[in-house]
Amino acid sequence: MKKLSLTLLIVFTTVKVSSQNALNYNVVTTAVPMLLVSPDSRAGAMGDVGVASTPDGNSSAWNPAKLAFLENKKASLALSYTPWMSKLVPDIDLAYVNYTKALSDRQGISASLRYFSLGEINFTDDQGNSMGTFNPYEFYFDVAYALKLSDHWSAGTALRSIFSDLTQGISVQGLQTKPGQSGAADLGFYYQGDYNNIKGGRRQAFSAGIAMTNLGAKIAYSESGNADFLPTNLRLGGGYHLEIDDYNKLSVYLDINRLLVPTPPDEENGAIVAGIDGDDLTPLMGVFQSFNPASKPGGFEEMLQENIYNFGMEYKYNDFLFARTGYLHEHKLKGNRQYVTLGFGLAYQVFTIDMAYLIPASPTTRSPLENTLRFSMAFNIDGFLAQ
C-alpha cells in the first residue's frame, strides 16, 4: 500500500509548476498527462514515434488519419499493458484496448479504451492523519474515423471522453472535490507514398503525418477550484521506408511534438515579472499563445525548448520478425526526458506480439518506465474467421 498526501497528489497531477530555480526550469504541465503516454509497445519501442509510421491496430492513438490506409475490410483487436513506476510500487499500470476496422479501401474506424490505475493509496491530511484508503483511476474512451482524400492522402478525426477520479470525492480543507470530466477531439492528416525503384534492386517510399490531439474543454476537480488545460499536443513527423529485398525492410522515423498550452510565467512575490498568466485563457487561445514568444519568460528561445524530438527505427523480416529502437529528447529545462528505447515483435498467423523496454540516456535522467518491460498483442479477427 502507498501512503500519499492528498495535497501532493493534486499538485503533481493537475497544477501547473510556476516556480523556477537557479537553472530556470519552467516545465509546462497539464491535467491528465497520461493521455500523452504511449499506450502501445510498437511505438514505445521506437522512441514514441507514431504520427507517420505505417498503419496498425493502434493507429488512432497517434494519428487517426492512418486508419484510412488499413488493409481492405481488415478488423483487429489490440491489447496493451504498461506497468508504471514498477520499480517503486507494484500496482500502478496503464491498460489499453483498441478495435480497428477498414470499412473499405478508403475508410477506416476505431474505438479504444485506456484505463490508468493509481493503485491503492492511503490518503492523509496535512497533519498526517489518515483520510481513508482509495483507488484513484482515470479512463479515456475514443472513437475515430478516417477517409482517403486521394490515393496518397487521408484525413481523420477522433472524439474522446475523459474521466479522472483522483480524490474519490473527499473534502480537502473545506473544499469538496469531485471527479474531473471533459471531452476532446483529434484531427490528423497522413501521406503514404508509393514505392519507387532505386539502385541495387531496392525500393523506397516516404510517409508523413501531422496531428493535433486532445483539444477540448478544461477539466476541474472541484466546483470552486481552477480548471486545468488538457494536454493538447501537436505532432509532426515523417518516415523513410527502404525495401532491401523481398524479405528485408527498414523504416526510419522522426517526430517533433509540443504541448499547445500556455507556458507558466516567472513570478516574484506573487507578481508576474515575465510571460503572461494563462489561467484565464480558453483552450483555443492557449493553442495560439503556445506559439507566441512574447508570452514566454524566455522568449523565442524558450519556445524552441518546448519541442520534443522522437527518433525511431524498425527492421522487418518477412513480415514475421520485427526489431525496433528509438530515442526521445526533451530539453533539460522542460522536463529532461532523454531515453533510449528497444523492442521486438513477432507475427504468427493471426497474432502479433510486441514488447518494449526503456533505458535512461544518462544517470541524471529518470522515467517512470525505466527498465520496465511493456507488452502489446494484436489479434487479426478477419484472419481468424477465414480459417
Report residues per predicted region:
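Bacterial Sec-dependent N-terminal signal peptides
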Residues: 1-23, 258
